[in-house]
Amino acid sequence: MEIYHQYIKLRKQFGRFPKFGDEGSEMLADIRPNEDHGKEYIPRNPVTTVTQCVPEMSEHEANTNAVILVNKAMSHVEGGWPKDVDYTEAEHTIRYRKKVEKDEDYIRTVVQLGSSVEDLIKQNNAVDIYQEYFTNVTMDHTSEAPHVKTVTVFKDPNNIKRSASYVNWHPDGSVPKVVVAYSILQFQQQPAGMPLSSYIWDVNNPNTPEYEMVPTSQICCAKFNLKDNNLVGAGQYNGQLAYFDVRKGNGPVEATPIDISHRDPIYDFAWLQSKTGTECMTVSTDGNVLWWDLRKMNECVENMPLKEKNSETTVGGVCLEYDTNAGPTNFMVGTEQGQIFSCNRKAKNPVDRVKYVLSGHHGPIYGLRRNPFNSKYFLSIGDWTARVWVEDTAVKTPILTTKYHPTYLTGGTWSPSRPGVFFTIKMDGAMDVWDLYYKHNEPTLTVQVSDLALTAFAVQESGGTVAVGTSDGCTSVLQLSTGLSEASPAEKANINAMFERETTREKNLEKAIKEAKVKARKEQGRRDEVKDNVTEEQLKALEDEFFKTTDPAVGGGYGAGEGAAAE
C-alpha cells in the first residue's frame, strides 16, 4: 500500500522561505492485521541459525613505495661554444664574440628585447622590495604549545641490530650530516658474525648511509674533527683510537698501538683547541685519561690516572667534558662511581691536576656538559636525576636537582640556543625537555620517541634539531618548535640571576650546617664537663686498694678471721 501526502502551494509563493509550526497529530493510515494470513503461519522447527559473538573486523594492508633519493650532477664545462672554438683560449672566445655581435639578426634581436627588458628594470627599481618595514622585532612564543616533529629516521642497515651508542652532528650547522656509532657494549654479548661498521648519514637521504667506517673493533664513540670536517675520530671497543678520512676509503687512516692504548673501551673523547686541530683526549673505564696527536699516533702525548688526592685508587671514566670557554687546559670527567672530577692538565704539580671531586649521583654519569652561555655552571646526568652544579670550591652540592624519575636516565645535554633549556633521555624510550625559564619541578615536554631504551643524544648547533639513538639501532631526527629553540630577549639575564640566587642559597645552607655542627660540638663538650672526670691513674689506684682489702693473704678480711678461730 502506497502512502503519500499531497502538499499544494501557489506559484507566487515559490522561492519564499517556509515557516513551519507545531500542529496536532493526524492519522494518515490505519492498517489492521489480517486474521486469514495469521492462520496460515507455520512455525519452523528446528531452525538453523548462525551467530557471530565477536566484533567483525577486516584486514587492510598498504604497501607504500619508499622514496629513494640519489644525488646526481653533470659538469658542463664546454658551454655553448661551437666545436671549432677552444673555450680555454681567451683569444678564440673574444674573436667569436665579435663575430656574433656583428650579425644583423643578433643586433635586431637585442634591440627588440631591450625595450621590454628596460620596462621590467624600471618596474623593479620603482619599489624597494628589500625594504624592512619592522626592525628588531622580537617573536613571542609564549602562546605556542611546545612540540616536536619527526624529520627522518636512520636505521642500522645490518641484520644483526646494534645500539646507536654515540651520535654527533657535523660542526657546520648548515651541513645536515650525522655520524652514528653502532656497538653492543654488554660484556660477552656480541653475537658471532656481528658487523663492525658505523656510518655517516645525510638527513636528506635517510635510505642509504653516505659513508661507511670499517674499523678493526666496534666503535663506541665518534666525532667530526672541528677544523677538517673530512676527518672523523673514533674510540673503539678494544681501547684504540682511530681516525677516518672520508676521502681515503672506508678503513681507518691510522690507529694507536694496542699496547699503549686503553685497556677498556673508549667511552668518550674530545678534540682539543690547537693550531693544527689534530690533538685530542680520550677517557675509558680503565681509569686513565690519554692525550693524542694525529700526526704522531704511535705514542701517547700524556697520561693522567683518575684518582683523588692522597688516594691510590683509580676510578673509571664514562664521559668527558671539554669547553674552551672554561679554559683550554680545564676539563671534567664523569665516572662510574657517580663522581665528577674537575681537572687542570697544566697544573704545576702533577698531584694537583685533579682540582676537586664532586659526589652526588648514585650510579655512572652518562652526561656532563657546561652551559654554553655561562661555562661556570654545568649539567650532570646519571642514575634517576639530572643536576646543575656551579664551579665553586665553596659549594659541594648541586644548586638544582630534578625529581627522581621511575626509570634510569641515559644521557642529555644543554640547548645551544637557549640558556635555560636542557634535554634528558630515559630507558623507557622517552625524551624530556626541561625549560628552567618557566618551571623547575617537571619537564615542559615529554616525547615518546621509541618503545625501546634511548642510548644516544645530540643537538645540532642551531638548537632546532636533535638526534636520538635507540637500542635497536634506529636514530630519529626531531625538529623542535620555535618556542624551544629561540630565546627571549631577557632569558639569559634571568637564567644567570636564578643560578646566582640558587648558588647563594646553597652557600647559606652550608654555612648554617657548619654553624649547627659547631654548636652541637659545644653542647657535647658541656655534657662531658658535667660528668665525673676520673683519670686512668685514679681508676688504677682504686682498683689496687680494692684488691688489697679483699685479699686473704694480707691478713685482713673475712678469710683471715675464720682461720684464727679454727686454731
Swiss-Prot record:
GO terms for biological process: cilium movement involved in cell motility; outer dynein arm assembly. It is found in: Cytoplasm, Cytoskeleton, Flagellum axoneme. Signal peptide: none annotated. The keyword Cytoplasm applies. Disulfide bonds: none annotated. It comes from the Eukaryota. GO terms for cellular component: cytoplasm; dynein complex; microtubule; motile cilium. Keywords: Cell projection, Cilium, Cytoplasm, Cytoskeleton, Dynein, Flagellum, Microtubule, Motor protein, Repeat, WD repeat. WD repeats lie at residues 214-254, 261-302, 360-399, 404-444. Consists of at least 3 heavy chains (alpha, beta and gamma), 2 intermediate chains and 8 light chains. Belongs to the dynein intermediate chain family. May play a role in regulating dynein heavy chain (DHC) activity. May function in holding IC78 to the DHC, or in stabilizing the entire dynein complex. This is Dynein, 70 kDa intermediate chain, flagellar outer arm. The lineage of its organism: Eukaryota, Viridiplantae, Chlorophyta, core chlorophytes, Chlorophyceae.
